[in-house]
Structures are given as structure tokens and as C-alpha cells.
Curated annotation (Swiss-Prot):
Main location per the UniProt record: endoplasmic reticulum
UniProt membrane topology term: Multi-pass membrane protein
Residue ranges annotated as Lumenal topological domain: 653-869
Species name: Mus musculus
Any one GO biological process: positive regulation of growth
Residues the record lists as N-acetylmethionine modifications: 1
Alphabetized Pfam families for the sequence: WC-rich, WCOB, WEF-hand, WSLR
InterPro entries reported for this sequence: TPR-like_helical_dom_sf (IPR011990), Wolframin (IPR026208), Wolframin_Cys-rich (IPR045400), Wolframin_EF-hand (IPR045460), Wolframin_fam (IPR026209), Wolframin_OB_fold (IPR045461), Wolframin_Sel1-like_rpt (IPR045458)
Glycosylation sites: 663, 748
Protein name, as recorded: Wolframin
Keyword Coiled coil: no
Length: 890
């Protein structure tokens, strides 16, 4: 195997068994390899001509281009050339030291052959070291040999294992990018330094675009200008002051894979800006900061004064005042005074607006990524000049895969918008304005799409818009009978129990639209799913949302939202003055119609937690808070909060009862026979309770005799909070938020006022806040008498009585009932069935023999939100949003 190996010295070929010259040559080569591992190529021996060494080094700098165009052919011809012409090993070694990747590969193969005969460990390590250098220049044969060495654990040490694994795992795309990046780096570094300053690289950017014959006369083409600006931003995006070869190669590889440095987006492309462009306000001198950022300077001075004034005194105050407990108490006090109806109104609106804002933010991020796409294509065009074998299609696929995050967040935001829109109050949603915004983003998102799938995206958008307009025709107030027929459903076909197929012209258009979706996904061997289809879904969702919101809009609102806001830009000064004047008048009228003192006190109370938070943190900074918010991902924060809100509300949906029918055939007499005193006497109460537990869940409507009602609990969180205040402040708050006791004058005609005036002398305070009381009642109901009106012993048995729990909403009804009134009530059998005086929750009540009708209605039903039907309606709306007019939910 060693017979073909040339001797390391020119004295003559030694016999193959002689190991000493070979070992000496291996050691010399290894030592020179370690010295020149990072250095650019140069002559390794001191007796060589320096000029020759320099020419060899400079010739080796663009050497990676040679294996780019004909690397495969050279590899295929390597065998025959060796057979025909024997090249001395010293000459191959000199070429390898000069940076020739082919020679480095041959030296590595030579040491691998030597490792089979003697000194396996030393020769294998030398071979791996040479193969690493060749693989770094994109030599495919060297990569294959490294993979074999890694599999056989030949020459693999703890120092080179990580590098060998990285080079062995590189794809063809990464290897091509590496070869092109090597050529660019040596053009940017003509002096062949180990590390180059960023400023020096920026000065040499122009040399990359120069042809072999030097700079071409005439204007520079726009494509070359874009490539030059792209290369400048790529170099200056590195945070280091000096860039080595490996750093530049890794940076280029990451960009080619779609991993873009964050500060690359923040760089300005305008080359004519002054030296202060791009600097933050903190980096500017005080004079320029005041001139350029006056608000920031004022805020910074205010923060400094607050910090100086508060650090000394507020530090010890924050240690003795339980601020967190106070914040929690005030928070729970506010929450305890809110009702379920308020949450049912407020939460869908919050979810809708937050998710809509998230959609807008994600769309803007998509627009930013479209700019990144343009820069990426500029870089690939630049790399193609140095590596024609670069797989641009695979590079674009990798870039698209690594930039799917804003699209995923956008689709999640769409889900929240779809589910919250049918639940939210349309009176609090500016549908016309949102429809115009949705239409605007439909057009702009389409314009930001890639041109690679333009035939499909253009046809898909036209089809979608046509289907949407045809679906809107039946709702147009104008009498266009012939046109409305185009949007009407011809007939429907049930598909299962929950889905209906609508046969219409828009339905056919949607079938064609789904076909176009499939064609877009089919591009590039179904890699077009995330390269073309997912980006187009942004345009699709905005278009669908605009159609849905247009159904809730008015013609006047659309005119106001489109033409009015366009004219608003031209009449901005006059409109601002008019709006300010109108707002001032309305604000003054609002204050005159309400109690000014009450509003101010309420505002102060609600702001207490915020004030405590600000003043107890000695190191609090407004600008720091703003910076932290800008650094965090607002979209992720919104999505996390929306998910938490929906999970919290899901428990109410799961437990909701709604307006269900209380029509069980179980009568009170049957219940008393099975679970009453007779059953207790036959067996015992425990056995009866176990047996009657099978009746749990029955929704019954029974008739009984009202015996009495009592208050079991009075909840007044406002009074509890006021009682903790000093006496004089508490009385003032009671009179501010409550009512004064009436005086006992002859003009009082109300019974309630007469009762209160008698308590005025006995009350501890001049005012009361009983209007905030919330009551819980217990009603005792007995079995009705017989049909003849006679009272039987069993019917008057108090052990058969049942107890009904009632909430504060039944207060007016219960206070008007009298003992012996015949009432009809609805409840659910649950709890201690089969025991004495079982307690059920009152769901509905009506009086059957009252002389006057109960106020405000004859039958009073417990207000319960039918959350399940509401969620069912939201699911139906979501299904129709995606599939109507092709399919619709039953």
C-alpha cells in the first residue's frame, strides 16, 4: 500500500518497511498542519521563495471555485491520473498546505493508508485533521471519508469529535453555501488575515462584485447594488469587532437556512443618513437627546428625580406596609362586585379585540418576513455567482420552514376571533371599520406573497372574492332579482346529522378554490404546503373575515369607514379642533349629569393598587417597563391570556344548565312515598337515602304551600370595606355612595320609608349602603292540601316539607308572598334525598292564588346563561366561516 507513496525527502524512495522517515514526515506535516490550521495558505518552508509562497497563497484563496464547477469530474479522474502520473508526496503536501482542498483530501487518504500498516492512532489523527480542512472548503469526498472515520472511530478525539460530527452532518446545500462563503470571505479579506475587523470587511465589500477584469465602467446595476447592501448588512449584523473565516461561514449558513439575526431587521438601508442614525436615545449626548427626543429626556429627568426622592424613604415604607396584601384585597373587592352577566358581556369583547390586534401584529410580521424573503433571494443570487450548484429551491424551503411562527400565531388568532365574534355584542364592535381594515389587509397580504406560485394565488384570490360577493348578493337591499339568484342556494343535501351540502354557484367556486389549495400544496413535492399554501391562508382568512363582518355592517358605516377616513387625512387640523371641542363639551355634560365627587373617589380607589405598585418599588422605571414590553413577544402574551380566559370559561360551559325544561313525571306524592316518613319507618333513613340517590338529577315542577322564608346570608362587600376605614371617613363614604335615612314627616307615603325613618334614631350612622346588599334565602314549602280542601294529617306532616335555596334575584317575589300561598316551583333533585327537610335550589317560582300579580312578572325564573347553546352557536359560526357556502352546519 505504501509503495506508491513518495518519500518526504528528495534523496530517493526508501524501502516501504522503513518507518522512521515516514514517521518524521508525518510529525512534520502534523506540526505544520496545527500551525496553519486557520491561517490562509502560504509557503511553509523558510528556504522557499517568499514571492512564490505569496503567489501560491493568493491563488489558493479563490481555490474553492475549482471544485465547485468540476469537483465530481476531478474526483472521477483522480484514479486514472494516479495510475498515469505519479505526483511526489512532497508536492501534494505543499499544495495541501497552500490550501488546495483536493490535495488536502489526498494527504488525508495517504495517512489513512499508512494507518492500516503502522502507528494507527497517530496516522488516523493526522488524516482526520487534513480531512477536516478539506471538508471545510466543501470537498464532498473529504466529508464521506470523515463519515467513515466517525463510524469506525478512527482518529476521533475529544478535541475534534464535535467538529467532525458537524461537518459530517452537513447537507449538500450547506456544503455549497460553505464553498461560496469561503470565496466571498477571501474577497473581503484580500490580505489573508486570520481575523478581519468589521470595518475593514465593509471597506472591501465592493470587491466582491468586481469581475475578473476589474471594475466595469458605467452605472452599477440595481441587482449588484442590492447584493452589495445585503452583504454590508450581513457583515455588520455580527456583534463581534473581528470576524474570522469560521464565523463568516457559519453566519452565511444560518442566513441561508432562514435563521436571520434580529438586529439585521433594525438596520436602515438608507446610506445618506447622518452619523446619529440608528442610535437609541440613551446613546445620544444630552444636548442632542433634548433636541431630538424631548419627551424621552423629560421622562428620564422625571424618573431620576423620583428615584432620588423616593429611594431613601420608600424603601423602609415598602418593608412595613403589606402592599401585596392590600393589592390583593382591593382586587378581590372589585371582582366580588362584578356579576356573571358582566363577564358574559365583557369577556367575548376582550377576546375579540385582543385576537384581532394579534391578527394585525402577525400580519405585519408576515410583511416583515416578505422583506426578509427579498433579502434572502438577493443573498442566494450572490451565492450562485460563486457556487452554481447551490440548490436554491431547497434553500427557499428551509427558509420558509424556519419562518412559520408568525403564520401559526396568525391562525391561532383567527380561531379566537371566529369563536368570540358571534358571542360579542355587535353594538360594541365597529363592524364597518373592521370590514375596511380586513379588506385592506386582504389586498396587502396578497401583494406580499411569493411570485413562484402566482398563477394559483391569483386565481384563488379571484375565486374567493367572486364567491364572497355572490354570497353577499342576497343581503343587498337593492331589488336585483336576477343577480340575487346567482348567490342563492338551489337545493341542500344533508350529509349526516350535523352537516348540510349547499348546491349553488358559490359552492362550485369553493370547490375550485379547494382544488387550487391542493395544487399550491402539491408544489415542490408537497413542500409548497408551508412555502405557498400557509402564506396564502393569511390572505384567505382576511378575505373571509371581511365578508363575515360586511354582513354586520351598514351602508352608511362603510361610507364613513372608507371615504370618511380618507378625507379625514386632508381635514385633519380642523377635525382635531372640532373633535377636541366636542369631546370637551360631552365630557363636561357627563360630569354635570353625574356626581363629580363620587367619580373622583371611585377613580382614586381603583388607582390605589397601581399607586402602591409605583411608589413602593424604589427601582421602578417607566422606560424600563416599556423596554421590557417591547422585548417580549406581544403576540405570544396575547395568545397565552386568551387561552387562559377560554380555559377559565370552559368550566362554566361544562357546568351550565341553561333554560332547560323541568318536566319530570315524578310527583311530590311519589317522592314522599319513596323517600318520606313511611319509607323511614319501613326500613331506616340511611337505607332510604341510598335508594333515593337514584332519583338525583330529576328536573321537577311541583305545587306546594308557602310556609315561610328567611334570610340565611347578607353579603355587602362595600360595607365591609368601609367599616375598616376611620369613623368620620366611613360616614362620609356611606353618604357618598349610599342613601340617607329619611325623616319621619307627614309627607312620607312609602311603607319602606316609614319603616326606615323609625330606625333613624336607633341607627349608628346617618346613612346606609343597603342597596349593595346581596341576600340568600331559604323557603320552606309544605305539601298541598287535598282536592276537597281538607287538611289531612299526612299532608300537614312537617317532615315532608322541603327547603328551597333562593338567590337575591328572587327577593321581590319572596317578600310579597304570604303564609299559605299556593306556589308552583321548579327545582332539581340533588343533595340529601331521602332525609328530613332536603334542600334544593330554586329555579323558578310563581304564585297560583295571589290576589295581586307578582312584580315584575307572574313567573320568575332564575337567570341562567345557556352557555352550551351559546358555544354551539359559536361552533356553527366557525364551521360556516371556513366551509360556507360549500358546507354549512345544521
Amino acid at each position: 500500500m505504501n509503495s506508491g507513496t513518495p518519500p518526504p525527502s528528495p534523496s530517493g524512495p526508501p524501502p516501504p518497511p522503513a518507518p522512521q522517515p515516514q514517521a518524521r514526515a508525518r510529525l512534520n506535516a502534523t506540526a505544520s498542519l496545527e500551525q496553519d490550521k486557520i491561517e490562509p495558505p502560504r509557503a511553509p518552508r523558510p528556504q522557499a521563495d517568499p514571492s512564490a509562497g505569496r503567489s501560491a497563497g493568493e491563488a489558493a484563496a479563490p481555490e474553492p471555485r475549482a471544485p465547485q464547477t468540476g469537483s465530481r469530474e476531478e474526483t472521477d479522474r483522480a484514479g486514472p491520473m494516479k495510475a498515469d502520473v505519479e505526483i511526489p508526496f512532497e508536492e501534494v503536501l505543499e499544495k495541501a498546505k497552500a490550501g488546495d482542498p483536493k490535495a488536502q483530501t489526498e494527504v488525508g487518504k495517504h495517512y489513512l493508508r499508512l494507518a492500516n500498516d503502522a502507528d494507527e492512532e497517530l496516522n488516523s489523527c493526522s488524516a482526520v485533521a487534513w480531512l477536516i480542512l478539506a471538508a471545510k472548503q466543501g470537498r464532498r469526498e473529504a466529508v464521506k471519508l470523515l463519515r467513515r472515520c466517525l463510524a469506525d472511530r478512527k482518529g476521533i478525539t475529544s478535541e475534534n469529535e464535535a467538529e467532525v460530527k458537524q461537518l459530517s452532518s452537513e447537507t449538500d446545500l450547506e456544503r455549497a453555501v460553505r464553498k461560496a462563503a469561503l470565496v466571498m470571505y477571501w474577497k473581503l479579506n484580500p490580505k489573508k488575515k486570520k481575523q478581519v475587523a468589521v470595518s475593514e470587511l465593509l471597506e472591501n465589500v465592493g470587491q466582491v462584485n468586481e469581475q475578473d477584469g476589474g471594475a466595469q465602467p458605467g452605472p452599477v446595476p440595481k441587482s449588484l447594488q442590492k447584493q452589495r447592501r445585503m452583504l454590508e448588512r450581513l457583515v455588520s449584523s455580527e456583534s463581534k469587532n473581528y470576524i474570522a473565516l469560521d464565523d463568516f461561514v457559519e453566519l452565511t449558513k444560518k442566513y441561508a437556512k432562514g435563521i436571520i439575526p434580529t438586529n439585521l431587521f433594525l438596520q436602515d438601508e438608507d446610506e445618506d443618513e447622518d452619523e446619529l442614525a440608528g442610535k437609541s436615545p440613551e446613546d445620544l449626548p444630552l444636548r442632542q437627546k433634548v433636541v431630538k427626543y424631548p419627551l424621552h429626556a423629560i421622562m428620564e429627568i422625571k424618573e431620576y428625580l423620583i428615584d432620588v426622592a423616593s429611594k431613601a424613604g420608600m424603601h423602609w415604607l415598602s418593608t412595613i406596609v403589606p402592599t401585596h396584601h392590600i393589592n390583593a384585597l382591593i382586587f378581590f373587592f372589585i371582582i366580588s362586585n362584578l356579576t356573571i352577566d358582566f363577564f358574559a358581556f365583557f369577556i367575548p369583547l376582550v377576546v375579540f379585540y385582543l385576537s384581532f390586534v394579534s391578527m394585525v401584529i402577525c400580519t405585519l410580521k408576515v410583511f416583515q418576513d416578505s422583506k426578509a424573503w427579498e433579502n434572502f433571494r438577493t443573498l442566494t443570487d450572490l451565492l450562485l455567482r460563486f457556487e452554481p450548484n447551490l440548490d436554491v429551491e431547497q434553500a427557499e424551503v428551509n427558509f420558509g420552514w424556519n419562518h412559520l411562527e408568525p403564520y401559526i400565531h396568525f391562525l391561532l388568532s383567527v380561531v379566537f376571533v371566529i369563536f368570540s365574534f358571534p358571542l360579542a355584542s355587535k353594538d360594541c364592535i365597529p363592524c364597518s371599520e373592521l370590514a375596511v381594515i380586513s379588506t385592506f389587509f386582504t389586498v396587502t397580504s396578497y401583494m406580499s406573497l411569493s411570485s413562484s406560485a402566482e398563477p394559483y394565488t391569483r386565481r384563488a384570490l379571484v375565486t374567493e372574492v367572486a364567491a364572497g360577493l355572490l354570497s353577499l348578493l342576497p343581503t343587498v337591499p337593492v331589488d336585483w332579482r336576477f343577480l340575487k339568484v346567482l348567490g342563492q342556494t338551489f337545493f341542500t343535501v344533508p350529509v349526516g346529522h350535523f352537516i348540510i351540502l349547499n348546491v349553488s354557484l358559490p359552492c362550485l367556486l369553493y370547490v375550485y378554490l379547494f382544488y387550487l389549495f391542493f395544487r399550491m400544496a402539491q408544489l415542490r413535492n408537497f413542500k409548497g404546503t408551508y412555502c405557498y399554501l400557509v402564506p396564502y391562508l393569511v390572505c384567505f382568512m382576511w378575505c373571509e373575515l371581511s365578508v363575515v363582518i360586511l354582513l354586520q355592517s351598514t351602508g352608511l358605516g362603510l361610507v364613513r369607514a372608507s371615504i370618511g377616513y380618507f378625507l379625514f387625512l386632508f381635514a385633519l387640523p380642523i377635525l382635531v379642533a372640532g373633535l377636541a371641542l366636542m369631546g370637551t363639551v360631552q365630557f363636561a355634560r357627563w360630569f354635570l349629569s353625574l356626581d363629580l365627587t363620587k367619580i373622583m373617589v371611585t377613580t382614586v380607589i381603583c388607582g390605589v393598587p397601581l399607586l402602591f405598585r409605583w411608589w413602593t418599588k424604589a427601582n421602578f422605571s417607566v422606560m424600563g417597563m416599556v423596554k421590557s414590553l417591547t422585548k417580549s413577544s406581544m403576540v405570544k402574551l396575547i395568545l397565552v391570556w386568551l387561552t387562559a380566559i377560554l380555559l377559565f370559561c370552559w368550566f362554566y360551559v361544562y357546568r351550565s344548565e341553561g333554560m332547560k325544561v323541568y318536566n319530570s313525571t315524578l310527583t311530590w306524592q311519589q317522592y314522599g312515598f319513596l323517600c318520606g316518613p313511611r319509607a323511614w319507618k319501613e326500613t331506616n333513613m340511611a337505607r332510604t337515602q341510598i335508594l333515593c340517590s337514584h332519583l338525583e338529577g330529576h328536573r321537577v315542577t311541583w305545587t306546594g304551600r308557602f310556609k315561610y322564608v328567611r334570610v340565611t346570608e347578607i353579603d355587602n362587600s362595600a360595607e365591609s370595606a368601609i367599616n375598616m376605614l376611620p369613623f368620620f371617613l366611613g360616614d362620609w363614604m356611606r353618604c357618598l355612595y349610599g342613601e340617607a335615612y329619611p325623616s319621619c314627616s307627614s309627607g312620607n307615603t312609602s311603607t319602606a320609608e316609614e319603616e326606615l325613618c323609625r330606625l333613624k334614631q336607633l341607627a349608628k350612622h346617618p346613612c346606609h349602603i343597603k342597596k349593595f346588599d346581596r341576600y340568600k334565602f331559604e323557603i320552606t314549602v309544605g305539601m298541598p292540601f287535598g282536592t276537597n280542601g281538607n287538611r289531612g294529617h299526612e299532608e300537614d306532616d312537617i317532615t315532608k316539607d322541603i327547603v328551597l335555596r333562593a338567590s337575591s334575584e328572587f327577593k321581590d317575589v319572596l317578600l310579597n308572598l304570604r303564609q299559605g300561598s299556593l306556589i308552583e316551583f321548579s327545582t332539581i333533585l340533588e343533595g340529601r334525598l331521602g332525609s328530613k327537610w332536603p334542600v334544593f335550589e330554586l329555579k323558578a317560582i310563581s304564585c297560583l292564588n295571589c290576589m295581586t300579580q307578582l312584580s315584575p312578572a307572574r313567573r320568575h325564573v332564575k337567570i341562567e346563561q345557556d352557555w352550551r347553546s351559546t358555544v354551539h352557536g359559536a361552533l356553527k359560526f366557525a364551521f360556516d366561516f371556513f366551509f360556507f357556502p360549500f358546507l354549512s352546519a345544521a
